[in-house]
Amino acid sequence: SAELMKRAYNMGCDIENHSQSHPDMTKMTAEEIKAEIDFTSDKVEEAVGERPQFFRPPYIAVNQTMFDVIDMPFICGYGAEDYNNAIGVEERVEKVLAQARDGGIILLHDMNGNVQTVEALDKIIPALKEQGYEFVTITELFHAKGVAIDPDSEIIYSYAEQTEMYG
């Protein structure tokens, strides 16, 4: 909702684009993809006054049409499969900590009833801070690493300094 976006933005979060309806965009036409992305970017801009700079493809499903149409770098991240309720708190913690790396993007979900991720974060955040990691926005990460926010990169970034499509 617009209120949640404003609240997160005012707390210092980036508000990026993940689509309006979470479709498999590889099965959509260029026009359908553009409409999906523009709708969401327009809503974000209405809510917080800035357009998204990054796009996270639903299901991490991509094709060349998406790269051609979507004028933003694609991001993914390392996660804990926390969309799966069968994955418990400790396993979520272990997965995230095992994949942590300098410049890495952590992907976790805020979904209905997903209290296990909230509980896991209570352990993940202090553990990563103890290891010297800092938590920054995607935009701050790219700037800190000197990585251009290039909409034509055709990379799905899981870490900032990535140079191949998948990292």
Predicted regions located by residue number:
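Catalytic domains of cell-wall/extracellular-matrix polysaccharide-remodeling enzymes
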Residues: E3-N10, E16, Q20-E134, T139-P151
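Short, basic/aromatic-enriched C-terminal tail that caps enzymatic domains
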Residues: G146-G167
